[in-house]
């Protein structure tokens, strides 16, 4: 059934704020939480109302059905989460006066986990990881495959993962995401294919979960790499205006930092092992622009892997030797391999056992007999 804004019972931002005020009164947070600017989401027929601390930092979101005026409790930030984030802001203010506090060194062992990454992440201690690098699973790249009921369900799951990654990351450290728009192929000849701008939705999730945007790196593949998707072939034959579709040969590598009142150079100046800092210095031949030309990787064992070279660059540029590098969607272990190769520790999680078995094999091969002292979860 199609709706337009005439059907909305929540018509204005003020209407949304009034409903939000009732919600905050109900959960007894009306005196400590403010509203950001409410926005209507035409795709899902809801109002999204940012929830902020009194200092202006975003701590969550209220989602209101624009037609029924009901609050979507499943998609609205939970009271416990709001309270924890408010307490976190207060603790952060207290730390501002302690400028001599040094960089924390994680004691986490190398870890391989089998299972849902959201659940596995909960087993990691807070502030036990120094870098997160991952490529999230594609959203329903094939019409016959539907792991998620909707794109919104997919984003909700990804936000939960990002939330846990924020918790386990050390202060001021980085989370780097390899992601690209997704083409949903048409289910029949009478339907059009659809391209979803996934990276831009992920950006919103990162900001909501307490990260700050640092850089957008463009991974450029050789010109012929994108033809496998079939995109652009029809135009190359007919050349009709309005049918132009460029062949995608790029992906995003988005860089975010866990918010901190400390500057980035604090990570270097206050590191307790200055020899490790020197040993981690990036060598000549590094990337000087945000355009990285790297050939894609292919594997008969996994349909979607990124190249080892990409993982190595990210690890070298955003971590020190002996740091812990986390990949919550570990696949066959590319990130973990790159970590071992570059003298870092790793934590790598994967849902499917066949990939975990390959991951373990690939990591041990990369280690070439070096003792890794791996902690296995659910294995």
List where the protein language model places each region.
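Long, contiguous binding/interaction regions
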Residues: 2-7, 57-59, 71, 76
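Short, charged, solvent-exposed linker or helix-capping segments at domain edges/interfaces
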Residues: 61, 73-77, 263-270
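Short, conserved SAM-binding/catalytic segment
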Residues: 101-107, 360-377
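Exposed beta-strand-loop-beta-strand "reactive/processing" segments of non-cytosolic proteins
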Residues: 27-67
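DnaQ-like (DEDDh/DEDDy) 3′-5′ exonuclease domain used for proofreading
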Residues: 84-104
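Core catalytic lobe of class I
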Residues: 97-358
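Short, non-transmembrane alpha-helical segments in secretory-pathway proteins
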Residues: 1-38
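A short, surface-exposed interaction/processing loop segment used at functional sites
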Residues: 66-90
């Amino acid at each position: 059934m199609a709706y337009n804004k005439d059907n909305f019972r929540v018509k204005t931002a003020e209407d949304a704020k009034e409903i939000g005020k009732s919600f905050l009164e109900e959960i007894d947070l009306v005196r400590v939480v403010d509203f950001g600017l409410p926005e209507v989401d035409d795709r899902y027929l809801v109002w999204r109302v940012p929830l902020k601390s009194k200092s202006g930092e975003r701590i969550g979101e209220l989602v209101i059905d624009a037609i029924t005026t009901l609050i979507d409790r499943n998609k609205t930030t939970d009271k416990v989460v709001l309270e924890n984030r408010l307490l976190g802001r207060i603790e952060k203010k207290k730390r501002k006066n302690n400028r001599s506090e040094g960089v924390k060194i994680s004691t986490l062992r190398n870890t391989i986990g089998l299972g849902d990454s959201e659940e596995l992440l909960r087993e990691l201690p807070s502030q036990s990881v120094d870098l997160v690098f991952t490529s999230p699973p594609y959203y329903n790249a094939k019409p016959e495959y539907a792991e998620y009921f909707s794109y919104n369900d997919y984003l909700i799951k990804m936000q939960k993962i990002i939330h846990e990654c924020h918790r386990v990351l050390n202060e001021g450290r980085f989370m780097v995401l390899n992601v690209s728009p997704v083409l949903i192929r048409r289910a029949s000849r009478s339907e059009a294919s659809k391209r979803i701008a996934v990276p831009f939705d992920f950006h919103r999730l990162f900001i909501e979960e307490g990260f700050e945007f640092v850089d957008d790196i463009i991974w450029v593949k050789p010109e012929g790499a994108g033809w496998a998707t079939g995109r652009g072939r029809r135009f190359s034959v007919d050349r009709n205006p309005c049918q132009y579709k460029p062949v995608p040969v790029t992906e995003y590598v988005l860089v975010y930092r866990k918010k901190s009142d400390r500057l980035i150079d604090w990570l270097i100046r206050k590191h307790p092992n200055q020899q490790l800092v020197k040993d981690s210095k990036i060598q000549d031949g590094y990337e000087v622009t945000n355009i990285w030309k790297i050939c894609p990787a292919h594997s008969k064992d996994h349909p979607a892997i990124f190249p080892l070279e990409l993982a190595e660059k990210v690890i070298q540029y955003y971590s020190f030797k002996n740091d812990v590098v986390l990949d919550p969607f570990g696949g066959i272990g590319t990130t973990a391999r790159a970590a071992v190769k570059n003298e870092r520790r790793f934590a790598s999680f994967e849902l499917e056992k066949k990939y975990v078995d390959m991951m373990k094999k690939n990591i041990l091969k990369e280690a070439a007999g070096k003792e890794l002292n791996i902690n296995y979860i659910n294995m």
